[in-house]
A protein has these predicted regions:
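Long terminal segments
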Residues: 1-34, 96-183
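Beta-turn initiation residues at beta-strand->coil junctions
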Residues: 54-59, 66, 76-83, 124-128
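Short, surface-exposed coil-to-beta transition loops
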Residues: 61-65, 76, 88-91, 106-110, ...
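C-terminal structured interaction module
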Residues: 122, 129-134, 345-396
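Intrinsically disordered, low-structural-confidence terminal and linker regions
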Residues: 163, 168-223, 401-440, 453
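Extended, low-hydrophobicity segments enriched in charged/polar residues
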Residues: 181-334
Length: 457
């Protein structure tokens, strides 16, 4: 059988309005970006019809694959993350259109599968009429792991492209010239949550404005006390529900401190014109050195590379109260909350010997909150900050006086240390869409039918 000819054109992305590649690139430009960690895209076409769009950002460890439907819309998306020795499918999303007139990404039914290593797949159906339905299903085998991406060897096959195999990839002619000048990028790799104005939260008199037009006035930080860390292993958790949260939820962070006592304080602010203070953050001070970098605090088994857009690994609060504590306090506190072990725990909580914890109000109440690690210019830990995420997006800061502005000079963010368990990837096979898409479609159809029966057609 004659191979199916697949033309590959390089570009910045896809222009849905023009139904064409956006800002075409020369092949050599794309190669250079691939090797230097800069983003680019590859448009795959058969007989001048787009069949797939590959988005690559090797610097961010991201590969996205869009498949086009017969109406020329991007209707299926694979999102992969580079875990060092293989690519892992993190998300698979489909837009199920009823007719050809529905706009791209405007389908009434959206289906999203989220993948984690060694955990069930979270399947979410978003129906514009019936609402949202989420369930968990077991993935039959490691269908979500594929080899690392090499330039020119794209994670597509005939099943995904709607073509007969074998496939023959042919590079399109280079554009005569590449567009120059600034432009609004049509896509970016998913990026986890970032710390927002953490330094400014502890500068009295600073004014912070967010993208919604809210203006916050920063108050004087309030000292909470000395946090005693006999083991140097620190935990952030809801002190009222430690016994219920499970080992992973209350595991100490992978960063360790020298055993000792550390000052803890809360950042307070109020909305301009109002008289009620809010706790915006809690900080454990390790040194007085300025923060040069921020990184997300991680527990064993957590890997920042798996986070989606604006996601974070946080600690959960169900009682409106949060706490920093030493790891040695967790078992004693859990025993205190367990009626069977209450008597045994009484000698330890509150106690004055081996453990201690300090509590603070958790922002607006229950939720999940990240902890950020601040490091100085030489990499030493200067503080840990529990962020109550009250500021929102589009933050601008105005601080009084040069000393205050220097104190809140914005530190850059760096990736946290990956804590994902090592997996045996020797058996990983080349990309094949059939197995994962059959699983996806069968599961989605079954759950959509179940949901329709339950909710009423």
């Amino acid at each position: 059988m004659e191979p199916t000819r697949v033309e590959v054109a390089y570009c910045e992305g896809w222009d849905a309005a023009a139904h064409a590649a956006f800002r075409p690139l020369k092949e050599q430009t794309a190669r250079e970006r691939h090797s230097t960690g800069r983003r680019y895209a590859a448009l795959l076409s058969i007989d001048a019809e787009p069949r797939a769009l590959i988005q690559v950002d090797t610097g961010a460890g991201y590969v996205g694959v869009f498949s086009f439907d017969l109406a020329g819309r991007r209707s299926l998306k694979f999102s992969y993350r580079d875990l060092g020795d293989h690519l892992m499918l993190r998300e698979l999303k489909a837009w199920r259109h009823v007719d050809d007139d529905e706009p791209e990404f405007g389908a009434d039914l959206r289906i999203t599968f989220r993948f984690w290593p060694d955990e069930p797949v979270r399947a979410t159906l978003d129906d514009a009429r019936r609402g949202q339905f989420t369930s968990y299903v077991k993935l039959p085998g490691p269908l979500h792991r594929i080899p690392l991406l090499e330039f020119g060897r794209w994670p597509v096959d005939g099943w995904l492209l709607g073509a007969f195999e074998p496939l023959e990839f042919v590079t399109a002619a280079d554009p005569e010239r590449e567009a120059e000048g600034p432009f609004w990028a049509p896509w970016s790799a998913p990026e986890g949550a970032r710390p927002t104005a953490l330094e400014a939260l502890f500068v009295p008199g600073a004014r912070i404005r967010n993208g919604q037009g809210d203006v916050f006035e920063v108050r004087e930080p309030r000292a909470v006390g000395k946090l005693r860390l006999p083991t140097g292993r620190i935990v952030a958790a809801d002190p009222a529900t430690v016994e219920l949260q499970g080992e992973q939820a209350v595991a100490p962070y992978t960063v360790t401190l020298t055993p000792g006592e550390y000052a803890m304080e809360t950042a307070r602010m109020r909305t301009a014109g109002r008289g009620t203070d809010m706790v915006a953050a809690a900080r454990v001070r390790v040194s007085e050195e300025p923060v040069a970098t921020w990184e997300l605090a991680l527990r064993p088994g957590q890997d920042e590379r798996l986070l989606g857009a604006s996601e974070f690994f946080g600690f959960v609060v169900d009682s409106g109260t949060a706490a920093f504590m030493d790891a040695s306090a967790v078992d004693a506190l859990a025993a205190y909350q367990d009626a069977d072990d209450a008597e045994a725990a009484e000698a330890t909580i509150p106690g004055d010997g081996v453990s201690e914890l300090l509590t603070f109000p958790s922002g607006k109440g229950d939720g999940s909150y990240p902890v950020w690690i601040g490091r100085d210019a030489v990499g030493s830990v200067t503080c840990l900050v529990a962020d109550m995420r009250l500021l929102g997006r589009g933050v601008e800061v105005d601080a009084p006086g040069s000393s205050a502005r220097n104190a809140m000079a914005t530190a850059r963010q760096v990736p946290g240390i990956a804590q994902l368990e090592v997996h045996d990837v020797a058996g990983i096979e080349a990309f094949s869409s059939q197995g994962i898409l059959e699983f996806f479609n069968d599961t989605a159809d079954a759950q959509a039918e179940f949901w329709a029966r339950r909710m009423g057609r």
